[in-house]
């Protein structure tokens, strides 16, 4: 029998992580078994091309895979995700050990393709075409209970074509899943032990409004999912500020299980740069959304994405972004230096900034964000919250076991419990005792449930 061991390396966003989790379960249902890096016959690399750095890491990883598996003559590699969609069959000539290249829509057929490749060692395949409809996958939940916190894709692709972004080219145009299919998957996960669901999409606000949708709005979907029996917490990522509907804002005040944390990407605080980016909102519009969210849910916590050093960004533009961070008071922001992405409008813009200027501005912005994050965490001290426990902490407690999980605001919380406690996937009432740099320490304040 042929060796059917596999190992998956994942780069990029939560959608990629979710894709890799599904692929692993699908392969195990087909008789494959996971193995450590360098020991598996099949290594799958799920790639990201949103920025240049993850893309370069992929090429470096492929070189390390070749070294690690050099003594296994039948070892081979499958490359999937956004870089695979972008480079395509070019991987075959550059990296001879690559035998499958699958794009973002091709993921659904990857398990069948890998079955063939294991049995036919001279075969190479590519799955790079975009499908007309959402590329629905086989329902694969694996054996036993699922994690307490799970992710559900509700759409694929994006129609926004922001000037800097390669996603519409690598994940295709927007395609919404059928509402009934989404609800069926959510019910199945809840039946298997899930208690928190995060809905995933490139632009969740426009769910259902493309030609592939069934007319259900995102706000309506939120209400349908929130009403499912057994769902204790609901989250979603990622909305686009230009599309966020009043009904979605209102949901934060009317749905008790919709968590009071929202990732609302700003990208830049300068109206001039926002226009160059093609974001189709200005700071006044963005701040009105923030005010409306806080009116609907006063304790809501916000996070953001920020691009530093977009072509033509002046010091004045950058200081407007710094001011926006302070005005909104983000609990966290994911900030990066701008990098050209092939085929995007921004690649052709003049007035590119030097690497030194971009790095200097990024350091200033992250220093400010660290201060804002510490302030937000400090504000949690003394508050009682429910923590969904995900597993043991890396560092054991002084007495007993140390567990960690997330509160409704998305904060990482560590709490000491009696040794031998079996509380994975359960909620625990705690009182926050101390704020650390990026997490909280808490004390048990009730029985787990």
Swiss-Prot record:
Reported cofactor(s): [4Fe-4S] cluster
SMART domains according to UniProt: Elp3
Catalytic activity: N(6)-dimethylallyladenosine(37) in tRNA + (sulfur carrier)-SH + AH2 + 2 S-adenosyl-L-methionine = 2-methylsulfanyl-N(6)-dimethylallyladenosine(37) in tRNA + (sulfur carrier)-H + 5'-deoxyadenosine + L-methionine + A + S-adenosyl-L-homocysteine + 2 H(+)
GO MF: 4 iron, 4 sulfur cluster binding; metal ion binding; N6-isopentenyladenosine methylthiotransferase activity
Keywords: 4Fe-4S, Cytoplasm, Iron, Iron-sulfur, Metal-binding, S-adenosyl-L-methionine, Transferase, tRNA processing
Name of the top EC class for this enzyme: transferase
Function: Catalyzes the methylthiolation of N6-(dimethylallyl)adenosine (i(6)A), leading to the formation of 2-methylthio-N6-(dimethylallyl)adenosine (ms(2)i(6)A) at position 37 in tRNAs that read codons beginning with uridine.
Annotated protein name in UniProt: tRNA-2-methylthio-N(6)-dimethylallyladenosine synthase
């Amino acid at each position: 029998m042929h060796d059917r061991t596999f190992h998956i390396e994942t780069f990029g966003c939560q959608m990629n992580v979710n894709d890799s989790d599904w692929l692993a379960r699908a392969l195990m249902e087909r008789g494959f078994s996971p193995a450590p890096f360098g020991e598996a016959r099949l290594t799958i690399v799920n790639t990201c091309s949103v920025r240049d750095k993850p893309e370069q890491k992929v090429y470096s990883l492929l070189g390390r895979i070749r070294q690690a598996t050099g003594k296994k003559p039948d070892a081979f590699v499958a490359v999937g995700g956004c870089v695979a969609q972008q480079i395509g069959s070019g991987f075959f000539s550059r990296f001879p050990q690559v035998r499958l290249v699958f794009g973002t829509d091709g993921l659904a057929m990857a398990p069948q393709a890998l079955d063939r490749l294991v049995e036919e060692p001279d075969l190479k395949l590519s799955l790079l075409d975009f499908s007309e409809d959402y590329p629905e996958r086989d329902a694969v939940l694996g054996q036993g209970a699922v994690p307490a916190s799970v992710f559900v894709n509700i759409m694929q692709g994006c129609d926004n074509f922001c000037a800097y972004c390669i996603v519409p080219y690598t994940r295709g145009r927007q395609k919404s899943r059928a509402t009934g299919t989404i609800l069926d998957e959510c019910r199945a996960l809840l039946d298997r032990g899930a208690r928190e669901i995060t809905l995933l999409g490139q632009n969740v606000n426009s769910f259902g409004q493309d030609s592939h949708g069934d007319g259900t709005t995102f706000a309506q979907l939120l209400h349908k999912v929130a009403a499912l029996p057994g769902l204790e917490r609901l989250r979603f990522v990622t909305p686009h500020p230009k599309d966020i509907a009043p009904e979605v804002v209102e949901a934060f005040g009317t749905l008790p299980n919709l968590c009071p944390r929202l990732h609302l990407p700003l990208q830049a605080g300068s109206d001039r740069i926002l226009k160059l980016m093609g974001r189709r909102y200005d700071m006044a519009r963005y701040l009105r959304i923030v005010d409306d969210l806080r009116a609907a849910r006063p304790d809501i916590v916000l996070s953001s994405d920020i691009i530093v050093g977009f072509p033509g960004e002046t010091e004045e533009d950058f200081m407007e972004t710094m001011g926006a961070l302070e005005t909104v008071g983000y609990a966290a922001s994911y900030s990066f230096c701008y990098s050209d992405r092939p085929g995007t409008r921004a690649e052709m813009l003049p007035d590119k900034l030097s690497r030194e200027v971009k790095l200097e501005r990024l350091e200033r912005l992250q220093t400010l964000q660290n201060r804002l994050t510490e302030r937000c965490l400090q504000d949690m001290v003394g508050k009682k919250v429910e923590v969904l426990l995900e597993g043991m902490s890396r560092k054991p407690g002084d007495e007993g076991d140390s567990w960690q999980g997330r509160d409704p605001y998305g904060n990482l919380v560590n709490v000491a419990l009696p040794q031998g406690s079996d509380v994975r996937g359960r909620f625990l009432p705690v009182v926050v005792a101390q704020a650390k740099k990026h997490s909280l320490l808490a004390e048990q304040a009730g029985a787990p449930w």
